[in-house]
Curated annotation (Swiss-Prot):
Pfam families named in the record: dsrm (PF00035), DZF_C (PF20965), DZF_N (PF07528)
Region span, Disordered: 349-371, 467-514
Signal sequence, renumbered to the chain: none
SUPFAM superfamilies for the chain: dsRNA-binding domain-like (SSF54768)
Oligomeric and partner information: Interacts with EIF2AK2. Associates with microtubules; it is unsure whether such interaction is direct or indirect.
Single Gene Ontology MF annotation: microtubule binding
Protein name in UniProt: Spermatid perinuclear RNA-binding protein
Biased composition (Low complexity): 477-497
Species the sequence originates in: Mus musculus (Mouse)
Sequence positions bearing Asymmetric dimethylarginine: R612, R617
Cellular component GO terms, alphabetical: cytoplasm; manchette; microtubule cytoskeleton; nucleus
Domain named DZF: residues: 5-363
Tissue localization of expression: Isoform 2 is expressed in spermatocytes (at protein level). Expressed in testis, thymus, ovary, liver, kidney, heart, spleen and brain. Expressed in cortex, dentate gyrus and Purkinje cell layer and granule cells of the cerebellum.
Amino acid sequence: MRSIRSFANDDRHVMVKHSTIYPSPEELEAVQNMVSTVECALKHVSDWLDETNKGTKPEGETEVKKDEAVENYSKDQGGRTLCGVMRIGLVAKGLLIKDDMDLELVLMCKDKPTETLLNTVKDNLPIQIQKLTEEKYQVEQCINEASIIIRNTKEPTLTLKVILTSPLIRDELEKKDGENVMMKDPPDLLDRQKCLNALASLRHAKWFQARANGLKSCVIVLRILRDLCNRVPTWAPLKGWPLELICEKSIGTCNRPLGAGEALRRVMECLASGILLPGGPGLHDPCERDPTDALSYMTTQQKEDITHSAQHALRLSAFGQIYKVLEMDPLPSSKPFQKYSWSVTDKEGAGSSALKRPFEDGLGDDKDPNKKMKRNLRKILDSKAIDLMNALMRLNQIRPGLQYKLLSQSGPVHAPVFTMSVDVDGTTYEASGPSKKTAKLHVAVKVLQAMGYPTGFDADIECISSDEKSDNESKNDTVSSNSSNNTGNSTTETSSTLEVRTQGPILTASGKNPVMELNEKRRGLKYELISETGGSHDKRFVMEVEVDGQKFRGAGPNKKVAKASAALAALEKLFSGPNAANNKKKKIIPQAKGVVNTAVSAAVQAVRGRGRGTLTRGAFVGATAAPGYIAPGYGTPYGYSTAAPAYGLPKRMVLLPVMKFPTYPVPHYSFF
């Protein structure tokens, strides 16, 4: 399995290559202007055709209908000659790259499109374009392609194809063989296959937007492979719809998001495995009702050539030479550069050992620890400050003046969900988050991914979410401090209530859990639930514990916190200040039995002198030992250390003779 570093190196090369083939902002703006202008002009052509078919109307009534055309479009769509215009191909899928910017639109007709309708739209379209913009466009008709070709006259040069089609053409083919009732086709009907291809392209665009647009790195890999199809003739037959299906299946079947380099390698692995070869699984077309192979148009030789080329590309990628597949210069390594080179021979050629660092190099600033520490700190800060901009700042730098809108706010009060949107080049992007700031950041990441810019802003989102959590915790801390002050004043000798509303754990002054520390001092305590108040999102529990005849209460948002609060109140009342010495309770270690008991008793009597009885306390008792803890050694629960106190020697220590006991063989099992 390859290391993550090698995948990161592939990601760097793929993203640099992607930045070179991605269209410039000027080209994207020109595409957006041209497509929007033609779409609006075709809408006016549709209105003009409807007015012509209905006959001459009064001027006032005509002007009113022109103004209400947009509002009544959905109602009158069934009776319109031109039902609508939709984007297909690279424009709808967002796969435009430099030197490969084929723009396509589909003009949907109510009836089967004819040459007469094509000429009518072609003649009226330039008139409507002149009303919308001052730019000059060349409009031509192509009857063989059932389309209208539109070209702009300034740089960058763009070509837009508007294909006429109708859903009646496909409905007619799907009728059963027994049905002979068919409408008579007009004599100047456009090419049926071209119209069917336009309908298929419309289905492909809808499928791509639903399945492939949401996959991470899928659009980037498709742009890289489209550039590969343009550069290498072997890959040219795979360009188009089959390539999109392969990428979606390869990347979408992974159980986790993939980076650009790893996603490209996964696609190459699928192609190199032989899925294109005869006898393989083939490539099912999901946009056709009948089982259809999307690779049926390719020859066997073409499939073998593509498989061989994919295997060679995968081999180069495995050896860290992906730059050869992308036809680019290798990028410098991201590893830190070593200052001293190690060679086998010295300058004179007589030495056989590696050169060491000269002694003079170590007499510089390294002798001063302050200067060395400052230099190391500067390196750390520089490495962390490589990219100080988050996704929102980066997008604002690329596209200034974007307007973010709040679409909705849902969820409960304690966990709201905000949905923000932004419109970029006619495309609306939406994202949600626990706050408006996070939702805007999510939207910015989506836009940057769609534009093809590298997005490594997961850390920014996590930082924002952590900041929001810290704000909430700071608010809760202020509440807890006030409540603790109030409860401290109302504490009595018989009962005490402590409420803590902090998000973090409750600890004593020694850094321990209050329940554990109180249990060490007084065993067998029982905590009782006194009350439970509040709604589902703001509960308040009160727990009570009785210690030495006194009752202490604690409150909190859950039983665990309330229990810890009650234990903390008991510790502060009974085991802190002047009451600590009186309530301190020493543990009694049970005496050993048999030979061990006799030996220990004799040793103790010998040390302490005549007339003394055996010790009733543990072997190690000192003033510095923590109450309730047994010093490690013989008789301890785990016995991982020698017979000595855990934190230094106590003032009073009994020395015991070393006792040896016979050991019995213990079976050992080995699994290696």
